[in-house]
């Protein structure tokens, strides 16, 4: 790809790594992105410019899906995450149908969606994405069913679903 902090591996999908999301809630032993977290600068890649993603997807009309990943993009404050997403929503091009956000926050810090200082701002951003006619998937990373059992996680799931976003889970087979 020609944009720092992005991989255009698949015809319709761009993986985007915002620089403020290059840390995580946990250090999972199976993570294949570990060089990004341990100070190996030559192996890191992250985007610092917020408008470049929009420019790139406008120039590549075959891109219909953006996966915002990291690290974990939900370690960022909502206003920083919105700086990447809102220009896409405001674009005159309508090629982006799906925005996915990969996160471990639902299992490790469900308060991100309920009681954090900017939790309501995050949920409002989710509503804004959905009301723009785009599909929003929160790609929740879980390692064990027990991570779904706490009241805090249940409340977070309810809050996310109320925005119109879908929650999809992914987990490594170990």
Model-found features: residue ranges?
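N-terminal [4Fe-4S]-dependent radical SAM core
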Residues: 1-16
């Amino acid at each position: 790809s020609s944009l720092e902090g992005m991989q255009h591996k698949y015809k319709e999908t761009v993986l985007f790594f915002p620089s403020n999301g290059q840390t995580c809630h946990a250090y999972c032993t199976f993570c294949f992105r570990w060089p990004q977290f341990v100070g190996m600068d030559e192996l890191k890649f992250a985007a610092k410019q917020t408008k470049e993603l929009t420019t790139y997807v406008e120039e590549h009309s075959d891109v219909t899906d953006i996966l915002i990943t990291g690290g974990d993009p939900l370690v960022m404050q909502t206003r920083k995450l919105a700086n990447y997403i809102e220009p896409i929503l405001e674009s005159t091009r309508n090629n982006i149908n799906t925005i996915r956000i990969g996160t471990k926050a639902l299992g490790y810090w469900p308060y991100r969606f309920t009681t954090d200082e900017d939790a309501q701002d995050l949920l409002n951003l989710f509503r804004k994405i959905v009301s723009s006619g785009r599909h929003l998937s929160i790609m929740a990373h879980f390692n064990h069913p027990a991570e779904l059992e706490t009241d805090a996680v249940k409340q977070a799931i309810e809050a996310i679903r109320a925005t119109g976003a879908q929650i999809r889970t992914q987990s490594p087979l170990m």
